[in-house]
Amino acid sequence: MDPQLPEPEPLIALIEALRRLPGVGVRSARRMAYHLLQHDLQGADMLGRALSAAVQHLRHCARCNSFTEDEVCATCANPKRDPGLLCIVETPADQNMIESSHGYRGLYYVLMGRIAPLEGVGPRELDFQRVIERACDGVVQEVILATNFTAEGETTAHFLDDALSERGLKVTRLARGVPAGSELEYVDAGTIAWALMERRST
């Protein structure tokens, strides 16, 4: 049972802020707060400054929707990338995993989420119209759906497949070497590289 002792308002605010992190409950948040305040004041100050700077200076890339300091991120601005390939992922973490596989040299679009009806997240919330406009720019020749192999990821991929295929785009999906129910963030780079090479038409 959580302690019922009264806590200072700044401590309560810190705990509530830490609870916003994924997978962090009230007990974990309280432990983090105690650790920072008791054992790592310098780290607490660094964390606060880093969060403030990130919120102030980061924005979404105008082309791929990932995080950047500039209007267009370094990946989208790289002339060595293949503009005919567009890989759609759920999160920047998934984008980083695909990049670490060294099996992809195209461009990306980051959804910043996935369709999750129970959470009130649908195509409108993910701004699918912007995704479609990006894919239909006249340069993209193939769209690779690299959403996670979870129920929500599959639903997202199915919706995008229908929307993009009816517009004449070639749409492919990562091969099933990625285990069902898994998230790309936790899949090894070798498996992702194989799944990219063996991707299948939808």
From Swiss-Prot:
One of its GO terms (molecular function) is DNA binding. The keyword DNA damage applies. Pfam families: RecR_C, RecR_HhH, RecR_ZnF, Toprim_4. A zinc finger (C4-type) spans 61-76. InterPro entries: DNA_Rcmb_RecR, Rcmb_RecR, Rcmb_RecR_Znf, TOPRIM_dom, TOPRIM_RecR. It comes from the Bacteria. Keywords: DNA damage, DNA recombination, DNA repair, Metal-binding, Zinc, Zinc-finger. Gene3D superfamilies: 3.40.1360.10, RecR Domain 1. NCBIfam families: recR. PANTHER family: RECOMBINATION PROTEIN RECR (PTHR30446:SF0). Belongs to the RecR family. This is Recombination protein RecR. It comes from Bordetella pertussis (strain Tohama I / ATCC BAA-589 / NCTC 13251). The gene is recR.
